[in-house]
């Protein structure tokens, strides 16, 4: 069975195609993505109207490329992200998916974007046992308890203010480094000293919420450090600031993720979201999981950011388990919860 997935929740227009065999195994046939990231760069963040227009312009070319890569004229099913995400962006992708499904005469499946990140993190793993997922991106920082791919997940904790990826973007802008901040800071951090500056780690005390995150204090601390240096006429090491900031973020993320695994008795930790491509996060997560006897499952780098493969993969897994097709009338939901069915 060939399943095509469309992703358009933010600034990437993604179409992925997977092949599902009778045993439930998946093979990636196509991964086509167009990003409007550079159009948002001068604004320092994603502009919803620009993102929606970019999806409209990119959808047909990206679809054609995905079908070319897959070597198929049409799939056996079409799936699309219906939430959470930007309202206009979601409408473009979901509407396109419904139109293609109707034109091809194949079933349509509505997919939860966050569930897609979990599914792709386990794409090359074996059957998923009880697990914890750490989803980290520009819009989300969450710890989720996962019993099976595609089923409703339980939120253990989330950010109380800025998402981790959002903190990266704000610190990058503060340092005049550009957008998006994640890859830029990660690259510079490799040349810096992560112990040069003692930036704070939010909500790490035992009395704090065990599974929640806070990065606003860290962001403010970086701003004050830079302002003080400028006021005193000191030249700062941007590399050291980046390394120390990144170490603080990754320290908190990995510490709390491993603690969540211990608290719920999970033996597998899944990483997902754009920040899961961060080199230090992957490295520190592996170190701490190894020490704790926890298996770490991380997607390929190209599947960490938003893509259509993760949507196709989640839909395919649920189809294999007997999921019914979605009504064509199903709407989009910008605030869709992870605690709802992941395909509906």
From Swiss-Prot:
Function summary: Required for the formation of a threonylcarbamoyl group on adenosine at position 37 (t(6)A37) in tRNAs that read codons beginning with adenine. Is involved in the transfer of the threonylcarbamoyl moiety of threonylcarbamoyl-AMP (TC-AMP) to the N6 group of A37, together with TsaE and TsaB. TsaD likely plays a direct catalytic role in this reaction.
Location (main, coarse): cytoplasm
GO cellular component: cytoplasm
HAMAP family: TsaD
Location in the cell: Cytoplasm
Family per record: Belongs to the KAE1 / TsaD family.
Segments of skewed composition (Polar residues): 326-344
Record field: catalytic activity: L-threonylcarbamoyladenylate + adenosine(37) in tRNA = N(6)-L-threonylcarbamoyladenosine(37) in tRNA + AMP + H(+)
Coiled coil: none
Broad class of enzyme this protein falls into: transferase
Region entry Disordered, spans: 325-344
Protein name as catalogued: tRNA N6-adenosine threonylcarbamoyltransferase
Binding residue positions for substrate: 135-139, 169, 182, 186, 278
Keywords of the record: Acyltransferase, Cytoplasm, Iron, Metal-binding, Transferase, tRNA processing
Organism superkingdom: Bacteria
One Gene Ontology term of the molecular function aspect: N(6)-L-threonylcarbamoyladenine synthase activity
Cofactor, free-text remark: Binds 1 Fe(2+) ion per subunit.
Organism for this UniProt entry: Corynebacterium glutamicum (strain R)
Residues noted as binding Fe cation in the record, renumbered to the chain: 113, 117, 306
Keyword tRNA processing: yes
EC number: 2.3.1.234
Database matches in PROSITE patterns: GLYCOPROTEASE
GO terms (BP aspect): tRNA threonylcarbamoyladenosine modification
UniProt cross-references to SUPFAM superfamilies, sorted A to Z: Actin-like ATPase domain
Alphabetical list of InterPro entries matching this protein: ATPase_NBD (IPR043129), Gcp-like_dom (IPR000905), KAE1/TsaD (IPR017861), Peptidase_M22_CS (IPR017860), TsaD (IPR022450)
């Amino acid at each position: 069975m060939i399943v095509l997935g469309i992703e358009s929740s933010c600034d990437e227009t993604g179409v992925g195609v997977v092949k599902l065999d009778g045993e439930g195994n998946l093979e990636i046939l196509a991964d086509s993505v167009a990003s409007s990231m550079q159009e948002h760069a001068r604004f320092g963040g994603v502009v919803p109207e620009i993102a929606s227009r970019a999806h409209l312009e990119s959808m047909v070319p990206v679809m054609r490329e995905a079908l070319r890569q897959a070597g198929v004229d049409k799939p056996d099913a079409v799936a699309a992200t219906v939430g959470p995400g930007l309202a206009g962006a979601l409408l473009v992708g979901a509407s396109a998916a419904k139109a293609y499904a109707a034109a091809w005469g194949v079933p349509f499946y509505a997919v939860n974007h966050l569930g897609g990140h979990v599914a792709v993190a386990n794409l090359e793993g074996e059957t998923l046992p009880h697990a914890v997922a750490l989803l980290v991106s520009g819009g989300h920082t969450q710890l989720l308890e996962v019993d099976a791919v595609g089923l409703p997940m339980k939120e253990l904790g989330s950010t109380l203010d800025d998402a981790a990826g959002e903190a990266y973007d704000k610190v990058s802008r503060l340092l005049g480094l550009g957008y998006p901040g994640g890859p830029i800071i990660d690259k510079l951090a490799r040349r810096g000293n992560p112990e040069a500056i003692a930036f704070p780690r939010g909500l790490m005390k035992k009395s704090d919420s065990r599974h929640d995150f806070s990065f606003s204090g860290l962001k403010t601390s970086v701003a004050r450090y830079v302002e003080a240096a400028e006021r005193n006429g000191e030249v700062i090491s941007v590399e050291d600031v980046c390394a120390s900031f990144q170490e603080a973020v990754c320290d908190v993320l990995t510490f709390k993720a491993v603690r969540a695994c211990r608290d719920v008795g999970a033996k597998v930790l899944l990483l997902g979201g754009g920040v899961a491509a961060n080199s230090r996060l992957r490295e520190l997560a592996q170190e701490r999981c190894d020490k704790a006897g926890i298996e770490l499952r991380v997607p390929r780098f190209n599947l960490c950011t938003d893509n259509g493969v993760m949507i196709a993969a989640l839909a395919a897994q649920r189809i294999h388990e007997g999921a019914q097709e979605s009504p064509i009338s199903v709407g989009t939901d910008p605030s869709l919860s992870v605690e709802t069915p992941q395909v509906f």
